[in-house]
A protein has these predicted regions:
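Extended beta-strand/beta-hairpin segments
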Residues: 1-36, 47-147
Length: 147
């Protein structure tokens, strides 16, 4: 069982499922694409804001770890969004502000999912060439805020 999905952009995304449920394991799972969409949405916001703040970013990743319910329909029950930033003298306050702006103002995926399940937003800042983070933390929205 496999499908091809497309939207207004015209790009085609292969959708598939595991052989245990009749698939050929030949495409992304729909729930994976939801999580990838969330990661992509906030990643584009955060890196754009950091570039405007003239931060010297050499590597940037957003990892989303999503917990799902054990029983069908196996909805997402919680997510941790982890921002991993590597660069030269990256300002921690700039990273925190970029994460805040994405969560509270710009990322529609985050705004929508924040109404459905809790999200924890964490970050790790690495200096170029270092294997351990120079700084780590979390964005905690104000009471009643997004995310």
């Amino acid at each position: 069982m496999s499908f091809a999905g497309s939207a207004d952009s015209g790009f085609v995304v292969p959708l598939g499922t595991d052989s245990s449920v009749g698939g050929d394991n030949d495409g992304s799972r729909p729930m994976e694409l939801i999580v990838i969409g969330l990661a992509g949405c906030t990643a584009m916001d955060v890196i754009s804001i950091l570039q405007k703040k003239r931060q010297e970013i050499t590597s940037f990743e957003v990892r989303v770890h999503a917990d799902r319910a054990a029983d069908h329909p196996k909805v997402i029950t919680r997510a941790v969004i982890e921002y991993v930033v590597t660069g030269q003298n990256v300002d921690e306050a700039a990273v925190l502000r970029a994460i805040e702006l994405s969560a509270a103002r710009y990322c529609p995926a985050q705004a929508m999912f924040a109404k459905v399940f809790p999200m924890e937003l964490t970050y790790s800042l690495y200096e170029v060439g270092q294997s351990a983070p120079a700084k780590q933390g979390a964005y905690v929205p104000a009471a009643g805020g997004a995310a």
